[in-house]
């Protein structure tokens, strides 16, 4: 299935101008909204964007730092993201290796996935680039998951 969606975070918002939600809703199948990074950063536009995208298929994505504690990072994400896990999905953004080993990256990813599963009843979607996954992650060491692979043009 081909679906078109957009990724939105404070980086996409210029001069504090609110996104045009009617245009986004008319042209997209889903929207991915950044909630934060690791355990200590909240995207300051998340709540506004999450509310603006109400009625769409929404995904909240959280950037994981592999050298940090998985529970602490997931606690931070769940403080940011309100949950309606019947319709909305959580995404782990896997793209900053930080010099960690493949084993550490895989174990932290697995731990985060299992925490999300225990709190929501489903595994998160995993977001990355295929080349990054091939270089830094042992996919066989993870539970089955849906993938969102970036394709930059």
Q: Can you annotate each of these PLM segments?
A:
Residues 7, 60-61, 125-126:
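Short catalytic-loop micro-motif centered on adjacent basic/acidic residues
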Residues 1-38:
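Boundary/entry segment of secreted carbohydrate-active catalytic domains
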Residues 6, 16, 45, 122, ...:
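Alpha-helical structural elements
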Residues 10-14, 36-40, 64-69, 95-100, ...:
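Solvent-exposed loop/turn segments at secondary-structure junctions
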Residues 22-29, 74-153:
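Surface-exposed substrate-engagement region within the catalytic domains
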Residues 5, 36, 40, 52-55, ...:
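Residue-identity detector for glycine
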Residues 11-23, 41-52, 68-83, 132-136:
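Alpha-helical scaffolding within the catalytic cores
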Residues 29-43, 50-67, 89-91:
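Short, well-structured secondary-structure segments
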